[in-house]
Structures are given as C-alpha cells and as structure tokens.
Amino acid sequence: MHYCVLRTFLLLHLVPVALSLSTCSTLDMDQFMRKRIEAIRGQILSKLKLTSPPEDYPEPDEVPPEVISIYNSTRDLLQEKASRRAAACERERSDEEYYAKEVYKIDMPSHFPSETVCPVVTTSSGSVGSFCSIQSQVLCGYLDAIPPTFYRPYFRIVRFDVSTMEKNASNLVKAEFRVFRLQNPKARVAEQRIELYQILKSKDLTSPTQRYIDSKVVKTRAEGEWLSFDVTDAVHEWLHHKDRNLGFKISLHCPCCTFIPSNNYIIPNKSQELEARFAGIDGTSTYASGDQKTIKSTRKKSSGKTPHLLLMLLPSYRLESQQSSRRRKRALDAAYCFRNVQDNCCLRPLYIDFKRDLGWKWIHEPKGYNANFCAGACPYLWSSDTQHTKVLSLYNTINPEASASPCCVSQDLEPLTILYYIGNTPKIEQLSNMIVKSCKCS
C-alpha cells in the first residue's frame, strides 16, 4: 500500500512540467486561411440548408428597390448593434444568460388609437387597388385604427403597447414574439414560408418600410403550434423611441412586385394568399361561412392563445454589478488579443471575396466580408509549482493525443446579412456567427 502511494507521489513530481505552448496542433497562416475559407463555404450552405451552391443564372441588371431597402435596413441594424456594444465595451451577455431574469408577458391589444392615414400610392398604370399599393399604404408607417383581427389575405399586422416597460429599457436582455399557428384544414397549399418584419416609420416612399427579422416554414394543415421569433432589437428600439413602435408584419416569402429596369415599371404579381391561420389575429370570418363546426373548433383552440411578447429583464441591481464586472474583463483581454504583431492567440484578419475565394456568383450583396479567424499560441497562465499544473501534466502523459493546454478559439461572433438569388428570385437571409470579432484561449 505504501509502495503504491509513493509511486503515485513520485509520478506526479517527476513528470515534466506542462509545456508553455498549447498542445493544439499548429498550422502556418496559409493553412489556417485555407481551412477557414473551406469552413465558411460549408457554414453558409449549411445555414441556408443547401447541399450545393445554386445553379448559376444571369445576374439581374438591377435589383428591385424594395429588396435593396430591406437588405440595407437589416444590415444597418446589425452594424448599429455592433457599434453600441463596442461603445459600451460589451460582449455577448453570457453572464446575464446564466443568472435568473424577470419575465414579463405583454398581450396583443385589441385596438390602437387612430393615426394619420397614408398618402395614396399609385403604380405606373395608375392603379391604386393592387396588392403593392395596399401593402405600401399599410407599411408606410402611418397605420389606420383597425383591429388586428381585420382580415388581410396577404399579410397580418400585429402591434403591442410596451410603454409600461420603458423605464426598464436598459435592463432588457431578450424579447420573444410568440404567436400560435392554428390548423387550417381548408388550406390550398400544405406548406408555406412565412416571414416576420418590423414595420418602419418612413418619411417618404423611397425609404424602407419594413425590416426583415426572421422566417419559418410552416405546415398549414398540420396541428397547431407555437411559433417564436427573437425580436429583442425591435423591442429595444421601441422602448427607447416610442414613436417607432408600429408593430410587426407577418407575410409570405414572395415579392409583391416585379421591377422592370428598361422602363422603370412596377408590375404587381399575383401573390399567393397567406394560408396559415393565427390565434387571436384571424377571426372566424377567415373560414368558410356556414361551417359552424370549424368555427366552433377554431374558437376553442384559440382560447388563451393570444399573440404576446415575452420580455426578459435583469433586475437593476444585478445589471449594475455585472456591467462593471464585464468591463473589467474586456480591459484585461484587449491588451492581450489585439496587438498588431503577436505570436500568441489573437484575432487575424481575413477578407472573403465570394467570387474570388469561393467561386460563387449567386450572392449579390455583400461582395465579400471580413470573416477573420483566431490563431496563435496559448501559454499557461498558472505557475509550475501548482497542483493544477501537475494534474494536467499527468493527464497529458496518459492521453498524449489530447490537448491538455488551451487552444485559440473564437469568443465574440456577429451575424452577416446576405442578399442572394435562387434562380431569378431574390432572398435575404441573416446568417448567425459568421464574423469573428475576438478570440480567447480555451
């Protein structure tokens, strides 16, 4: 027994001290870049649920203005969000995600006060009754006082009163919009892709009227289900700017108009109706008249399922303590990771040109982006006489293929908004975690 104890003791002390450099496999910078480029290729296709790049089609001479407006407003929102974090010396709120948060539920009200009506919009043909005109009037930011249950075949408008939460605006951690999709047995299509937009208040008809948030594919005839959307940025904006609270728009993924560059005409498309039905938004009038069985069933399934917001806020005392803690951490890391010339773990610049580096022509905007990557050695920060070092040395001896020391990995990442084409159809998507902003040893 004493022999075994002595043997273990000697083993712990005689094993060489862990190396000062990371045991993670090392690569030269060219290899790092090639691997990063290939990883981005797979990441983009995977996030778009594509097994291979779309077939090459001739690029349009000009992208429709309404598509560019949506892309620009979504891109600007992400840039504003990143700028706010940088100015406040903030990271992703990993600490706040750990602690308990106060949750508030805000139900959709049945009515909103009357506001200024939109100016009449006409197309090149002079028509004001097309879907394009109607949509422009509803989305221009000056909404009529009509109840949410007013039936619109192509889209739905949802609004919320968050004025009671304005005093806690800085405490907002996350906001979720939840809406219950009802089963629609009479739907003409079995599946539709619905999109959620934030309605913007525009000063004129050239300004964007909506900002893309997210999309989901739903089965219209299937059993009902809750749909959740992250609307943190929109609600945060409403809490700080009350006049910008114009609600959300739920619509189909299809352009309402076709823009012809040669003569600047806008031709309204025959849009597919929104077959998905939502509790608390779609009244019984959306179903066939006289079908009392369907109406009764719909009312029962809609009970207690009003569209609502779930707001998660940190208590003020906890937010203050965590903000000071977070800023101290940022200051410590900044000097280590962002030197111009450094062999240790730090952020390395890498610009991806979609055509040059990936051979892709189907992404229209942006032409490329700063993807960046993390590389460098991760020295141990503990001394050689600590028991922790000895345990790691023993572990490294028993598991020579494993990494007992930290590796240089990404820490803060930001999303990327892209405008791309599938055939002749423009699409706008927000890809999460595409831009590396800082690194750490982990």
From Swiss-Prot:
Residues 1-20 form the signal peptide. Disulfide bonds join 337-346, 345-408, 374-439, 378-441. One of its GO terms (biological process) is response to vitamin D. Keywords: Cleavage on pair of basic residues, Disulfide bond, Extracellular matrix, Glycoprotein, Growth factor, Mitogen, Secreted, Signal. Gene3D superfamilies: 2.60.120.970, Cystine-knot cytokines (2.10.90.10). Interacts with the serine proteases, HTRA1 and HTRA3. Interacts with ASPN. Interacts with MFAP5. This is Transforming growth factor beta-2 proprotein. It comes from Rattus norvegicus (Rat).
